[in-house]
Amino acid sequence: MSRPVALVTGGGQGIGAATCKRLAQDGYDVLLTYNTSSQPAEMLVDEIRESGYDALAVKVDCANDGEVGLLGIHPWMARKIDVLILNHGAYRRVAADQMTIETLRNTMAINFEGAVGVYKAVQPHMTDNARMVVVGSQLGIRGSPHGADYSASKAALAVWARSLAQQ
């Protein structure tokens, strides 16, 4: 019998890496994405494999529809996804009154639209009992004077996730 599969976006470092390690400890094979740095992601893959589970890191810019689309046809999708963790994100500290529309659009493209895109690409390959976790932030509730764009993107994610849960 094959092991369950977890997909973690932004899994190469930080909260994502810790989540990948925990999922492997809980018996999952892990497909993780990274965007900017392959080395930490590959080191994590090696660590998970050494513990007896399978893991693979793939480069995906979640703001790039083409790369997200390729994730949706990745060979691991044939194994079916049991857990989807939408963890990727970008946070650039910019004072709220200095934020440009371009900055806002870029952050929303990565953090919000990217998460929706990954979900749409992967959803046909999720098991009937699959679970999804959307990693949020308290800044999505209370805002931030140095990250209004990030706060808005996390608020959008929270509302979107609640909307999906109501279906």
What are these regions (language model features)?
Residues P124, Q166-Q167:
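Alpha-helical segment proximal to the catalytic Tyr-Lys
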Residues S137:
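Residue(s) in the substrate-gating loop at a strand-loop-helix junction
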